[in-house]
Curated annotation (Swiss-Prot):
Species this chain originates from: Danio rerio
Keywords linked to the UniProt accession: Endoplasmic reticulum, Membrane, Repeat, TPR repeat
PROSITE patterns (alphabetical): TPR, TPR_REGION
Cross-referenced InterPro entries: EMC2-like (IPR039856), TPR-like_helical_dom_sf (IPR011990), TPR_EMC2 (IPR055217), TPR_rpt (IPR019734)
Subunit structure of this chain's protein: Component of the ER membrane protein complex (EMC).
Positions of TPR repeats: 87-120, 155-188, 192-225
The UniProt record lists the keyword Nucleotide-binding: no
Family named by the database record: Belongs to the EMC2 family.
Descriptive protein name: ER membrane protein complex subunit 2
Length: 297
């Protein structure tokens, strides 16, 4: 079987740089990381210098995602040999135990880290992840709220708490979490989109108007956000269909929905240009939009 470097005609430096790019941009493309990283480690480890250690960590986490315990274990052993007393490496060992569903053992490991360093936020958040994995949502919510009282600026924790509230159908609290995220990072289109989705789910005219506003803001920040585009179409359509709105509001929202529908159709046509199978996709989208169409009558 051909190696990655042979298959794609890339050098080891290009493979190393690709892994760095994925790290910096927080890509969770685990299968690709395993493919590139495993070859880089096996064939070029001696050339990587100090980069090898962060690559071991990156590949190990990806290997856990891909159920490659053999690769995760070998990366972990290299890290343990180099950093035998590192809390960061202990946390990685705990993550492997989580992947094996050995939650009690993982908790003991995280507790030992917290005993040495009570301010270790990573270990504390891993314990919350275990509660989620065990289906203990109420306990996870309580622990996250306590954590955020101390570390109010932790965006990852706010986002995780919003997801937990959504899973529990507590949309008002989920919206509050996302509002906190938008205040600290107003240019993140995903936060705007997710907030809009929560408001849309809550329903009611006021929430639908907020949903439309934030779907539009998400599109302003990233005009390729298709979820936001569909969301804008749906929220504007529902507002236009409401018997509570004035003729002007209805007219405006019919216009917004028509614009969104045109953009959706155009995006599908552009994405599948030259592909026969795309004709069916475009037709399905057009039929879906037609079935939801709001008229001026």
């Amino acid at each position: 079987m051909s190696s990655i470097s042979e298959l794609y005609d890339v050098t080891w430096e290009e493979m190393r740089d690709k892994l760095r790019k994925w790290r910096e941009e927080n890509y969770r493309n685990s299968e690709q990381i395993v493919d590139v990283g495993e070859e880089l480690i096996n064939e070029h480890a001696s050339k990587l210098g100090d980069d090898i250690w962060i690559i071991y960590e990156q590949v190990m986490i990806a290997a856990l995602d891909c159920s490659r315990d053999d690769l995760a274990w070998s990366c972990l052993q290299e890290l343990k040999r180099q950093f035998p007393d590192s809390h960061r490496v202990k946390r990685l060992a705990g993550m492997r135990l989580e992947a094996l569903e050995r939650y009690d053992d993982a908790n003991k490991l995280y507790d030992s880290i917290l005993q040495d360093d009570p301010t270790n936020t990573a270990a504390r958040k891993r314990k919350i992840c275990i509660l989620r994995a065990q289906g203990k949502s109420s306990e996870a919510i309580r622990e996250l709220n306590e954590y955020l009282e101390q570390f109010v600026g932790d965006q990852e924790a706010w986002h995780e708490l919003s997801e937990l509230y959504i899973n529990e159908h507590d949309y008002a609290k989920a919206a509050f979490c996302l509002e906190e995220l938008m205040m600290t990072n107003p240019h993140n289109h995903l936060y705007c989109e997710q907030y809009a989705e929560v408001k849309y789910t809550q329903g009611g005219l006021e929430n639908l108007e907020l949903a439309r506003k934030y779907f539009a803001q998400a599109l302003k920040l990233n005009n390729r956000n298709m979820r936001a585009l569909f969301g804008l179409y749906m929220s504007a359509s529902h507002i236009a269909a409401s018997p509570k709105v004035s003729a002007k509001v209805k007219k405006d929202n019919v216009k917004y929905a028509a614009w969104a529908a045109a953009q959706i159709s155009r995006a599908y046509q552009m994405a599948g240009r030259g592909k026969k199978e795309n004709k069916c996709s475009v037709k399905a989208v057009e039929e879906m939009l037609e079935s939801l169409q709001i008229t001026m009558s």
